[in-house]
């Protein structure tokens, strides 16, 4: 089935510079660069080498912008398949369970390329101002009690009135743990840290970083984007920071259910046992008192963040008595969403 005029225009407008050429990056679309966001040195009392990967510099303020771009690339795949005559009909819609950040990032990209609006399943208790911001940029909103139970992808599509579409939350075919944040993962591991602290919400970012690390430690034929130190990387401890407190300031890291996450005790134990990461790599619960201290440090240094985004700094402060003070620490700040006014 031939593409319509509109579809031809959309396809032409989606330019993927390269899959993995650091000299020809794909993100952000209007000003591609690698690395796409800066890594800056910060001062943390008691530590001599602390660096912060600052994803707040992305278009809508968080690392989710990278995932948003990958959804545009997915639509490009849909259009190319239709152009080849492999599929028929109109472009499908995408659905997602979201607390706001991912929705704003993805919908901002979809809107820019004139693609179908994102269908968002939100918790009935989500802040009305966030809901209003999402609606303002075209998100279609559907509310339910997300604490009730984990939702199957079929239920997510049903609840978002999207029977012929696809659910981003659950789809393995989208390669969420190797593709959503692959460029970001290289930007992080190329710093060759001894310790890396990463917010753990859906788990996609943590899993991406570990999977890219595993890939580079398992081959002599490195990805062109890899510029790190293999020996150092093998012993890097990757710490995920999360919470099980529904009232935590790090609200984006709390989820009553994570049915689609791969990480579990056995998953990380195998990675450690195979030598794909340092021996202390794991996901840890943060305490609110250390999150408050992290907030004070971030404020004092003009870092743009939300509490969930600097959970890694909180975890470093929480573990400070067990950490060497002269090793290279890298904290991933996943940023702060710029909600449309």
Language-model regions, residue ranges each:
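Positively charged, low-complexity intrinsically disordered leader regions
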Residues: 2-85, 89, 289
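Phosphate-binding loop/pocket of nucleotide- and phosphate-handling active sites
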Residues: 4-5, 246-247, 311-341
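Active-site/ligand-binding loops adjacent to catalytic centers
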Residues: 21, 33-36, 132-133, 139, ...
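A glycine-rich, Thr/Ser-enriched phosphate-binding loop motif common to dinucleotide/cofactor-binding enzymes
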Residues: 57-74, 169-188, 304-311
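Short glycine/serine/threonine-rich phosphate/pyrophosphate-binding segments
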Residues: 65, 69, 95-113, 128-129, ...
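Alpha-helix C-terminal capping segments
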Residues: 73-81, 104-115, 210-217, 314-323
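Active-site-proximal loop->helix
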Residues: 91-96, 101-159, 249, 341
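Active-site/ligand-binding-proximal alpha/beta "capping" segment
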Residues: 159-220, 289-298
């Amino acid at each position: 089935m031939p593409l319509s005029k509109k579809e031809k225009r959309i396809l032409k407008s989606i330019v993927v510079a390269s899959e993995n050429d650091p000299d020809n990056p794909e993100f952000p679309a209007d000003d591609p660069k690698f690395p796409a966001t800066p890594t800056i040195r910060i001062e943390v009392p008691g530590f001599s080498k602390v660096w912060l990967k600052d994803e707040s510099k992305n278009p809508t303020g968080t690392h989710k912008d990278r995932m948003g771009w990958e959804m545009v690339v997915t639509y490009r795949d849909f259009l190319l398949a239709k152009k080849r005559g492999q599929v028929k009909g109109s472009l499908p819609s995408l659905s997602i369970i979201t607390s706001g950040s991912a929705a704003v990032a993805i919908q901002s990209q979809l809107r820019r390329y004139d693609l179908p609006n994102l269908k968002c399943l939100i918790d009935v208790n989500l802040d009305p101002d966030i809901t209003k911001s999402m609606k303002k940029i075209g998100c279609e909103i559907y509310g339910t009690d997300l604490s009730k139970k984990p939702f199957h992808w079929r239920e997510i599509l049903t609840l978002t009135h999207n029977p012929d579409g696809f659910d981003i939350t659950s789809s393995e075919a989208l390669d969420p743990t190797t593709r959503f944040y692959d460029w970001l993962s290289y930007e992080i591991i190329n710093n060759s840290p001894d310790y890396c602290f990463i917010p753990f919400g859906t788990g996609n970012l943590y899993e991406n970083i570990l999977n890219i690390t595993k890939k580079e430690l398992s081959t002599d034929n490195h990805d062109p984007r890899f510029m790190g130190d293999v020996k150092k990387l093998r012993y890097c401890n990757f710490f995920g920071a999360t919470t099980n407190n529904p009232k935590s300031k790090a609200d984006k890291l709390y989820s009553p259910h994570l049915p689609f996450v791969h990480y579990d005790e056995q998953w990380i134990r195998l990675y450690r046992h195979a030598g794909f990461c340092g021996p202390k790599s794991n996901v840890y619960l943060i305490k609110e008192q250390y999150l408050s201290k992290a907030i004070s440090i971030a404020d004092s240094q003009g870092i743009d963040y939300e509490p969930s985004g600097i959970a890694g700094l909180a975890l470093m402060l929480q573990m400070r008595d067990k950490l060497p003070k002269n090793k290279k620490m890298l904290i991933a700040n996943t940023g702060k969403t710029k909600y449309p006014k």
